Amino acid sequence: MARETRSPSPVGSTHSSSKRSRRNDDYLDRSRRDDGRGHRRSRSPPRRHRDRDWDRHRDRDRDRDRDRVRDRERGRDRERDRDTYRKSDRSVDRRDYRDDVRDDTSYRPSRRDRSRPRYHSRDREDGREYRHRSRDRRRRDDSADSKSIAKRNESRDRVSSKDFTGKSREVSKPSTPAPPIAQTDEEKKAERLAKLEAWKQKQAAEKERKQKELAAAGGARSILAEIDKRSTLRQAGVSQETPAPQESESASAKKFDPKTITKNAAAQPERLSLLGNDVAVPNTTTSSEVAGRNGADSTRIAPLKPRGNVSGFGFGAKSAAELEKASHKRALDFGDEESSRKKLMKLPDPSLEDNDTPNGTVNGAEEEEDDDGDIDMQDGGTEEENAAAARAAAEKREERLQNQTVALESQPEQQPETLETDQNGSAEPMDVEDEEEIDPLDAFMSGLKDSVTVDASKYRKNVSKPKQEPEAIFGDEDDVDLKAMDFEADDFLAITSKTRKKKDLPTVNHETIDYEPFRKSFYTEPVDLAELNDEEVAALRLELDGIKVRGVDVPKPVQKWSQCGLGVQTLDVIRKLGYEQPTSIQSQAIPAIMSGRDVIGVAKTGSGKTIAFLLPMFRHIKDQRPLENMEGPVGLIMTPTRELATQIHKECKPFLKALNLRAVCAYGGAPIKDQIAELKRGAEIIVCTPGRMIDLLAANSGRVTNLRRVTYVVLDEADRMFDMGFEPQVMKIISNIRPSRQTVLFSATFPRNMEALARKTLTKPVEIIVGGRSVVAQEITQIVEVRPENTKFVRLLELLGNLYSDDNNEDARALIFVDRQEAADGLLRDLMRKGYPCMSIHGGKDQVDRDSTIDDFKAGIFPVLIATSVAARGLDVKQLKLVINYDAPNHLEDYVHRAGRTGRAGNTGTAVTFLTEEQERYSVDIAKALKQSGQSVPEAVQKMVDSFLEKVKSGKEKASASGFGGKGLERLDQERDAARNRERKTYKTGEEGEEDEEKEKKEKDKGEELFAKAASAVQSSSAPTPSATPGVPKGIDLDGKITVHKTERATPSTTGTNPLDKVGSAVADIHARLNKAGVMRSGVPIDNKGPDAGAFHATLEINDFPQKARWAVTNRTNVAKILEATGTSITTKGSYYPPGKEPGPNENPKLYILVEGDTELVVTNAMRELMRLLKEGTIAAADSEARAPASGRYNVL
């Protein structure tokens, strides 16, 4: 036979050099062939193949040097072996060679090989640990040669113990001195040689380490005596049953696995003394004898396998049954892990002794072992010594990594992975089926978790702590983990409410902060203005649209840009923009602001208020030092709407480039990450809405931006800021700014009640009013028509037709205002049907859509825009010639701002307003606006005004106050507090007060009310009536436990005439009639007596929950998870009824869920999970509704 003896000169070896170039080409082919059958020929389960990926990363650094040493020793041998093996990889000789292993049978297909390890369990044990460790080394070699060697070594490993015994001695002799042609057997035998190398290293490391430990522990004799004692005590019990796999031991030299020691000590007790000898490896049998003994004793001694938790010190004891159970339930059951950890802590702690081993000694031992040849492995001891050496080698490698750097925790975490993997690879249990059932990923993760925990305790122990203290720590950590994994569904409400809580800014104590000084006043009165007396100044102000000022020492108005005290760069930009001279508000406001005064500026729409506060801000910023890293802005501009913020930011841009400044526009609806990135790069100016500014200040614990350097604050459209609900947010932001700041307020309308509120933020302000507080510009032609509702759309089409019929108005724009979001979308649909290209904008749209719509409208892509009052402020379109109030504004200021969208910057425009007979209340403000702007009031409108005033005098109507009348955020805070109190009382957190139930019922929070229904668990009919809880329907107790009913089985009817039976039947009829109401009342068991009914059942009504909550408990994915976890049956029954509708007498009950199970426990668990899903779905529905409300007149932006 060609390959009978595996001689050093096999057939085909002469082609070694010529075929060397095929190494990389054949690698993929051989890997594919080996994948099909290689692992099964090696008697190893498929799991070993799956472990390769993380084995490769684990020991790459550790074994690379040892592999290179062996490569240098056997490099020439491999050259010939590779080529020979490649040539004869699938040859007849190979099959002949395998005949000895397979009892002279031909090569079998891979399909039959799958079950071979079950019937050759004895042969599978031979050299298993050698084989696994050799694979690891070959995998970690980066060269192509090593990869080829890895595949061949894996294939060579398929040799059974019979061949191994007969040929290993013959192979090992010529391994080192053989010429290159005579190295074939060395290459084919590389895996066994690697295994011998590994065991030799472990032995040498064991001896060297134990010498130092024995020196500190009192010598080797005490340990040997303890080993003998343990062996004799356990010998009788172990010999009567099937021996369990050997267990990987801890690093302690004082204790070994009793089962392994007992089995070996019974046969060879006299060899135990070798463990305490010198570091030199004792002489034992050759490698072939070791392999033979392994094959012969495979039924008596099982290979090593780690059955305890892998730690930084060693291994804890754990039975095979416990390991199997833990591997199957690793992800859910923490009980086994806790038990194993406690067992681990009962072992002696060798951490301090291990750390005493010098790193250099350990490394030196490894180098010494690597330099030894294959012949040195013949000095290996008995199987007992080999097992001890394996344990010691693993511990030695751990010490080496830990001694390199104790501070780095990553290496100790990786080392337990190495220990567990090595032992898994080097030792396998005898039962193949049990072995295959163990998931390698679960075993790996379990070992990693335990190892990390033990490493942490090891460092605690090094800080002079008792040895047994880590056991208590383990228990504490387990308790924490279990509690975190098993949190109640009620806790989810607290978590959700915590996430929903608005971000809050801490209160700043300005007295403790040392602000750097800054200069406010930059204005020097020109000589020509200083010569004017009071009469001339009054006449000048009258010429400038009747400027009215109030305050102390107000500067005189300027007439030219050169008198404002601005810089050269700013004046150049003004000249390029075509601003010839200041407007009325600019001529008075710029000198006042440049003087460092706080200013309230009220001017008509389109009068240039934005430039009036921007130009002084640029001069203010340029006077201060440049921004440094992580410093906040100097100028802060807050606006009520996002559109106004973007418009102000655009007006800043021409000046920013010339002055080398940066500005950031921050508003809600846009991605906050982009705004944060711009702020971190540094910006002197922030144009923002209050809500987003608070988000930015609170983001990342306040490290995104700050208000330390803010000295110039602008509130544009200030009245809207305070009455639209921004007052708490604005005051919160302003309270974080230095008190010596300069604050400027501008608006086109400023009611008296808003003025008192705004003055809280100012210091001795100068009030400037141009043309009246709430006046429409005279350039705007105002038309008010009283007409029925059904004629407004026809009149709208007529107005649009007249506008675009004129060729001069080809590029004109039209803006239509409505009062509600739904009306905007409906009017958009109607106009599109009539052929007018248009778009709509309102608070319910995304910010991206709103921005693009306004840009398209300004660019003329579509000429008609339909909007709510969200576009009434700040929208500046030069070509806008027609404004139509399709729905009349409800107060004066809104009318002024709507009409002010046209006729801007001296241009003319038209504003048409539709009034219906029912809108007498609104006619008063419109008539007032007409009078103040110098226009006549139509007769029909005046009649409506007189009629309404008569009703007010008679008490039938109440006069409406001026202004928007926003309720602010106090109402929202009150509702939130009421919801929190209701929640506390509902779940009995111990913080609830004695609030009146009826008062709490008046508080309407839809999300919390729906959530209250989430715990509608079925209670027993005999249970006492629960106490009424606010917000919870009658008969439902959130704190009541889940009651599971025992299903009644149908019994054969009896024909007796017992009076008690008649009474029972009458009661049953009454209950049946009552149940026909169709409502699944709490505590009423269902009529479920069929043969397929479960022994226990419970019901959960879901009809009144929002759609998201119902979907959460009825979708197939969630239900399947519950069914798999509990083994119950979940059925959706009944019919869905909309809110407010109740089922009729003969109709199905409301939608509910039926849960059936064999035990009360599984039904309870399923009900608890369903209730948790209901709560989450209810809260999610409430959140989504809060983020995007269905409708609303105004939106807090």
UniProtKB/Swiss-Prot annotation:
Residues annotated for ATP binding in this entry: A603, K604, T605, G606, S607, G608, K609, T610
Residues spanned by motif DEAD box = 716-719
Q: Which InterPro entries match?
A: DEAD/DEAH_box_helicase_dom, Helicase_ATP-bd, Helicase_C-like, P-loop_NTPase, PRP5/DDX46/KHDC4_KH, RNA-helicase_DEAD-box_CS, RNA_helicase_DEAD_Q_motif
Which Gene3D superfamilies does the record match to this protein? P-loop containing nucleotide triphosphate hydrolases (3.40.50.300)
Of the GO CC terms on this record, one is: nucleus
**Reaction(s) catalysed (UniProt annotation):** ATP + H2O = ADP + phosphate + H(+)
Which residue intervals are annotated with compositional bias (Polar residues) in the record? 233-251, 402-426
User: In what residue span(s) does the Helicase C-terminal domain sit?
Assistant: 795-945
State one Pfam family annotation.
DEAD
Keywords in alphabetical order, please: ATP-binding, Helicase, Hydrolase, mRNA processing, mRNA splicing, Nucleotide-binding, Nucleus
Q: Where in the cell is it found?
A: Nucleus
Per the annotation, the residue ranges of the short sequence motif Q motif are 559-587
Q: Name one GO biological process term.
A: RNA splicing
Question: Where do the Helicase ATP-binding domain residues begin and end?
Answer: 590-768
Q: Which spans does this entry mark as compositional bias, Acidic residues? A: 365-386
Q: What is its EC number?
A: 3.6.4.13
Positions with biased composition (Basic and acidic residues): 23-37, 51-112, 120-129, 151-172, 185-213, 321-341, 968-991, 999-1011
EC category name = hydrolase
GO MF terms here are: ATP binding; ATP hydrolysis activity; nucleic acid binding; RNA helicase activity
Q: Where are the transmembrane segments?
A: none
What spans are recorded as compositionally biased (Basic residues)?
A: 38-50
Explain the purpose of this protein: ATP-dependent RNA helicase involved spliceosome assembly and in nuclear splicing. Catalyzes an ATP-dependent conformational change of U2 snRNP. Bridges U1 and U2 snRNPs and enables stable U2 snRNP association with intron RNA.
In terms of PANTHER family, this protein maps to: ATP-DEPENDENT RNA HELICASE DBP3
The family assignment reads: Belongs to the DEAD box helicase family. DDX46/PRP5 subfamily.
Q: What is this protein called?
A: Pre-mRNA-processing ATP-dependent RNA helicase PRP5
